[in-house]
Design a protein with these regions (language model features):
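Short, polar/acidic, helix-capping and beta-turn segments at strand->helix junctions
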Residues: 1-132
Length: 132
């Protein structure tokens, strides 16, 4: 499966590298086969970041879309680092942070937006990491 063909089938366009909010690397290679990837906000080419809390200002579905947008940004950053997303052999770990109201407990469902995108683009064997 060619990752770029799959992205096109899903209607996903890769973006320019994510603007950084501090002094750090978007992607940091470690050894020959591992990349550490910085997190990113859910901005896209059309509108700015979502700012607010799940459970009070945003629904679970809107949170899932934000998580999906974050993953598109991460995949875009990986493309710019690697030059070819087909080089990726496995995603090992997905760590997600969700800003939420005090009585919101559906964080796993929100992060499914990012996990589902990885699975849809890369398949189960490559795109289904452990998650926290």
């Amino acid at each position: 499966m060619n990752v770029y063909d799959r992205l096109e089938e899903l209607g996903i366009k890769l973006l320019d590298p994510t603007p950084k909010g501090g002094i750090y690397s978007l992607v940091r290679p470690y050894g020959d086969h591992l990349l550490y990837v910085s997190g990113t906000a859910p901005h896209n080419a059309v509108d700015s970041n979502m700012a607010g809390k799940l459970g009070s200002e945003y629904t679970i579905e809107e949170g899932q879309e934000a998580a999906r947008r974050c993953m598109i940004n991460i995949i875009s950053n990986l493309h710019h680092e690697l030059g070819d997303l087909n080089r990726i052999r496995q995603f090992v770990k997905l760590l997600g942070f969700v800003a939420s109201a005090p009585d919101f407990y559906e964080h796993p469902q929100v992060l499914n937006g990012a996990s589902q995108l990885l699975k849809d683009v890369f398949g189960d064997e490559i795109g289904l990491p452990a998650r926290s």
